[in-house]
Amino acid sequence: TITHKGKPHLYALVVGTSDYSGTNLDLRFPDLDAAAMAHGLQAVGTRLFEDRVYIRVLSTAGKIPQDISTRANIEKTLKEFAEKAGTGDVVICYFSGHGTTYGQAEKNQFYYLTKDIGSENLSDPEIRNNYTVSSGDLTKWLTAIPAHKEVVIFDACHSGKAVEALSSLGAKDLSP
Protein backbone atom coordinates (compact mmCIF):
# COMPACT_ATOMS: atom_id res chain seq x y z
CA THR A 1 0.00 0.00 0.00
CA ILE A 2 1.29 3.41 -0.99
CA THR A 3 0.94 6.16 1.58
CA HIS A 4 1.33 9.63 0.11
CA LYS A 5 3.35 12.04 2.22
CA GLY A 6 2.14 14.93 0.09
CA LYS A 7 -1.27 16.15 -0.94
CA PRO A 8 -3.98 13.75 -2.11
CA HIS A 9 -4.69 12.95 -5.75
CA LEU A 10 -8.05 12.46 -7.49
CA TYR A 11 -8.45 9.42 -9.73
CA ALA A 12 -11.70 9.20 -11.68
CA LEU A 13 -13.00 6.59 -14.09
CA VAL A 14 -15.93 7.94 -16.09
CA VAL A 15 -17.77 5.44 -18.30
CA GLY A 16 -20.61 6.08 -20.76
CA THR A 17 -22.09 3.52 -23.12
CA SER A 18 -24.63 4.77 -25.66
CA ASP A 19 -23.80 2.62 -28.70
CA TYR A 20 -24.08 -1.13 -28.16
CA SER A 21 -23.50 -4.00 -30.59
CA GLY A 22 -26.49 -3.82 -32.94
CA THR A 23 -29.18 -1.21 -32.35
CA ASN A 24 -31.56 -2.88 -29.86
CA LEU A 25 -29.90 -1.46 -26.73
CA ASP A 26 -28.63 1.89 -28.02
CA LEU A 27 -29.22 4.90 -25.77
CA ARG A 28 -28.99 8.61 -26.55
CA PHE A 29 -27.31 10.20 -23.56
CA PRO A 30 -24.75 8.08 -21.64
CA ASP A 31 -21.80 9.29 -23.76
CA LEU A 32 -22.91 12.89 -23.22
CA ASP A 33 -23.48 12.23 -19.50
CA ALA A 34 -19.96 10.83 -19.19
CA ALA A 35 -18.46 13.84 -20.97
CA ALA A 36 -20.40 16.22 -18.70
CA MET A 37 -19.38 14.30 -15.57
CA ALA A 38 -15.72 14.32 -16.63
CA HIS A 39 -15.91 18.07 -17.28
CA GLY A 40 -17.48 18.67 -13.85
CA LEU A 41 -14.95 16.47 -12.07
CA GLN A 42 -12.10 18.26 -13.84
CA ALA A 43 -13.44 21.69 -12.87
CA VAL A 44 -14.04 20.81 -9.22
CA GLY A 45 -11.03 18.51 -9.05
CA THR A 46 -8.55 21.19 -10.06
CA ARG A 47 -9.92 23.49 -7.34
CA LEU A 48 -9.46 20.83 -4.67
CA PHE A 49 -6.52 18.81 -5.99
CA GLU A 50 -4.81 21.39 -8.24
CA ASP A 51 -2.73 19.49 -10.83
CA ARG A 52 -3.17 16.13 -9.07
CA VAL A 53 -6.25 15.10 -11.07
CA TYR A 54 -6.32 12.02 -13.30
CA ILE A 55 -9.58 11.42 -15.17
CA ARG A 56 -10.01 8.50 -17.53
CA VAL A 57 -13.07 8.67 -19.82
CA LEU A 58 -14.23 5.50 -21.55
CA SER A 59 -17.22 5.84 -23.85
CA THR A 60 -18.65 4.69 -27.12
CA ALA A 61 -17.79 8.15 -28.46
CA GLY A 62 -14.10 7.21 -28.12
CA LYS A 63 -12.16 7.34 -31.38
CA ILE A 64 -9.39 4.88 -30.49
CA PRO A 65 -9.79 1.37 -29.02
CA GLN A 66 -8.31 2.22 -25.61
CA ASP A 67 -10.93 4.97 -25.12
CA ILE A 68 -13.95 2.71 -25.73
CA SER A 69 -16.17 1.50 -22.87
CA THR A 70 -15.19 -2.18 -22.92
CA ARG A 71 -14.83 -4.51 -19.96
CA ALA A 72 -11.09 -4.86 -20.67
CA ASN A 73 -10.54 -1.08 -20.62
CA ILE A 74 -12.54 -0.66 -17.40
CA GLU A 75 -10.57 -3.42 -15.69
CA LYS A 76 -7.24 -2.07 -16.99
CA THR A 77 -8.00 1.44 -15.71
CA LEU A 78 -8.98 0.25 -12.23
CA LYS A 79 -5.86 -1.91 -12.03
CA GLU A 80 -3.79 1.17 -12.96
CA PHE A 81 -5.51 3.07 -10.14
CA ALA A 82 -4.59 0.22 -7.77
CA GLU A 83 -0.93 0.65 -8.75
CA LYS A 84 -0.87 4.46 -8.55
CA ALA A 85 -3.28 5.49 -5.80
CA GLY A 86 -2.28 5.85 -2.18
CA THR A 87 -4.32 5.62 0.98
CA GLY A 88 -4.90 9.38 1.11
CA ASP A 89 -6.18 9.65 -2.46
CA VAL A 90 -9.77 9.84 -3.70
CA VAL A 91 -11.19 7.49 -6.35
CA ILE A 92 -14.47 8.19 -8.15
CA CYS A 93 -16.12 5.78 -10.60
CA TYR A 94 -19.11 6.85 -12.71
CA PHE A 95 -21.04 4.49 -14.99
CA SER A 96 -23.84 5.57 -17.35
CA GLY A 97 -25.61 3.07 -19.61
CA HIS A 98 -27.57 -0.17 -19.33
CA GLY A 99 -27.56 -2.22 -16.18
CA THR A 100 -29.37 -5.42 -15.37
CA THR A 101 -29.37 -8.22 -12.84
CA TYR A 102 -28.69 -11.90 -13.36
CA GLY A 103 -28.42 -14.96 -11.14
CA GLN A 104 -30.48 -17.03 -8.76
CA ALA A 105 -31.53 -15.74 -5.34
CA GLU A 106 -28.46 -14.83 -3.23
CA LYS A 107 -26.14 -15.13 -6.25
CA ASN A 108 -28.10 -12.46 -8.15
CA GLN A 109 -25.72 -9.65 -9.15
CA PHE A 110 -25.83 -6.29 -10.90
CA TYR A 111 -24.20 -6.18 -14.34
CA TYR A 112 -23.14 -3.03 -16.19
CA LEU A 113 -23.37 -3.72 -19.93
CA THR A 114 -20.37 -2.61 -22.01
CA LYS A 115 -20.11 -1.63 -25.67
CA ASP A 116 -19.76 -5.06 -27.25
CA ILE A 117 -22.95 -6.60 -25.86
CA GLY A 118 -26.01 -6.88 -28.09
CA SER A 119 -28.76 -7.99 -25.69
CA GLU A 120 -29.63 -8.14 -22.02
CA ASN A 121 -29.64 -11.96 -22.12
CA LEU A 122 -26.83 -12.92 -19.75
CA SER A 123 -27.47 -16.67 -19.59
CA ASP A 124 -24.18 -17.38 -21.42
CA PRO A 125 -21.21 -17.12 -18.98
CA GLU A 126 -18.94 -16.06 -21.88
CA ILE A 127 -21.16 -13.03 -22.46
CA ARG A 128 -21.06 -12.12 -18.75
CA ASN A 129 -17.28 -12.62 -18.52
CA ASN A 130 -16.40 -10.64 -21.65
CA TYR A 131 -19.03 -7.94 -22.14
CA THR A 132 -20.24 -6.93 -18.68
CA VAL A 133 -18.86 -5.69 -15.38
CA SER A 134 -20.57 -7.39 -12.46
CA SER A 135 -20.92 -5.91 -9.01
CA GLY A 136 -18.60 -8.72 -7.88
CA ASP A 137 -15.95 -7.70 -10.44
CA LEU A 138 -16.18 -4.08 -9.41
CA THR A 139 -15.93 -4.95 -5.72
CA LYS A 140 -12.80 -7.03 -6.36
CA TRP A 141 -11.13 -4.31 -8.45
CA LEU A 142 -12.00 -1.50 -6.02
CA THR A 143 -10.86 -3.52 -3.02
CA ALA A 144 -7.40 -3.70 -4.62
CA ILE A 145 -7.19 0.12 -4.69
CA PRO A 146 -5.60 1.38 -1.45
CA ALA A 147 -7.48 4.71 -1.41
CA HIS A 148 -9.64 5.06 1.69
CA LYS A 149 -12.08 7.39 -0.08
CA GLU A 150 -13.91 5.72 -2.96
CA VAL A 151 -17.17 6.84 -4.56
CA VAL A 152 -19.15 4.80 -7.10
CA ILE A 153 -22.03 6.37 -9.05
CA PHE A 154 -24.31 4.39 -11.37
CA ASP A 155 -26.75 5.96 -13.82
CA ALA A 156 -28.17 2.60 -14.90
CA CYS A 157 -31.26 0.47 -14.31
CA HIS A 158 -31.06 -2.07 -11.47
CA SER A 159 -28.01 -0.35 -9.97
CA GLY A 160 -29.48 -0.66 -6.48
CA LYS A 161 -28.43 -4.31 -6.60
CA ALA A 162 -24.79 -3.21 -6.84
CA VAL A 163 -25.04 -1.60 -3.40
CA GLU A 164 -25.25 -5.02 -1.73
CA ALA A 165 -21.90 -6.15 -3.17
CA LEU A 166 -20.18 -2.78 -2.91
CA SER A 167 -21.17 -2.37 0.74
CA SER A 168 -18.34 -4.76 1.59
CA LEU A 169 -15.93 -2.00 0.56
CA GLY A 170 -16.74 -0.34 3.85
CA ALA A 171 -14.92 -3.24 5.50
CA LYS A 172 -11.56 -2.25 3.96
CA ASP A 173 -8.68 -2.06 6.38
CA LEU A 174 -8.43 1.66 7.04
CA SER A 175 -5.43 1.55 9.34
CA PRO A 176 -2.77 4.13 8.37
Give a label for each model feature.
Residues 1-10:
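Pro/Ala/Gly-rich low-complexity, hydrophilic intrinsically disordered segments
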Residues 3, 26-28, 102-103:
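Short consensus segments that form the blades of beta-propeller domains
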Residues 9, 67-167:
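Caspase-like (clan CD) cysteine peptidase catalytic core
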Residues 12-23, 57-62:
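Acidic/histidine-rich, surface-exposed loop or edge segments in extracytoplasmic proteins
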Residues 21-39:
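Glycine- and acidic-residue-enriched helix-capping/strand-helix junction motifs
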Residues 36-53:
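Signal peptide-proximal N-terminal region
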Residues 48-64:
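Short helix-loop-beta-strand segments that form the rim/entrance of peptidase-like active sites
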Residues 171-176:
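Short, intrinsically disordered, charge-balanced linker/junction segments flanking boundaries
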